[in-house]
A protein has these predicted regions:
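Small-residue hinge/turn detector
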Residues: 39-49
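Glycosyltransferase-associated regions of secretory-pathway enzymes
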Residues: 1-37, 53-174
């Protein structure tokens, strides 16, 4: 409706090699699909570029204004929100996220799972390597990445479930 020229691609076991990353292979064998998807979203954007959307996202306007950035993300109430973000192919930050996953195991030495939410390493890397300031305001980083305030991508109150339709909002996460 808002981006009719965009192609929607589904990624699954038929077009993604589950064994390409040890963390992913372990999460897949444990049937922890969300952690598989966390890696795949970065893998796809690194290799193809594009805009990632969780399946429970509803666009409310075109993403076209965001394409001027090398990559874009949004702040949430606390940290980053990653059910939607976009990137050109082969960006350094996305490569750094993939490297982070390749250095980790999903099954830790004590047998428990590494269920670190993907926004934790993303925020750490953006702050340490790219100069992000966690002030929840619009920022353009030196590499061409833009970080938007929460009202652009994060409209659902985590405690009440209430959705606020900010004028700046691009999509709603249900």
């Amino acid at each position: 409706k808002f981006c009719p020229e965009y192609a929607i691609k589904e990624w699954n076991e038929h077009n993604f090699d589950i064994n390409s990353c040890g963390y992913v292979a372990e999460a897949y064998l444990q049937k922890k699909w969300a952690f598989v998807a966390d890696y795949v979203r970065f893998y796809v954007l690194y290799n193809e570029g594009g805009i990632y959307l969780d399946t429970d996202m509803e666009m409310v306007r075109s993403f076209e204004p965001l394409r001027k950035h090398k990559a874009f993300f949004g702040f949430a109430t606390d940290g980053l929100t990653l059910p939607v973000f976009g990137s050109e192919a082969k960006t350094d930050f996305i490569a750094d996220m993939l490297d982070d996953y390749h250095k980790r195991s999903f099954i830790k030495l004590d047998g428990t799972y590494d269920t670190t939410p993907l926004d934790v390493p993303a925020l750490r890397i953006l702050k340490e390597k790219y100069g992000l300031i966690e002030n929840y305001q619009y920022q353009e980083l030196a590499d061409g990445t833009a970080i938007y305030p929460k009202q652009y991508f994060y409209s659902t109150d985590a405690n009440t479930g209430k959705i606020t339709k900010y004028p700046e909002l691009f999509c709603i996460h249900y």
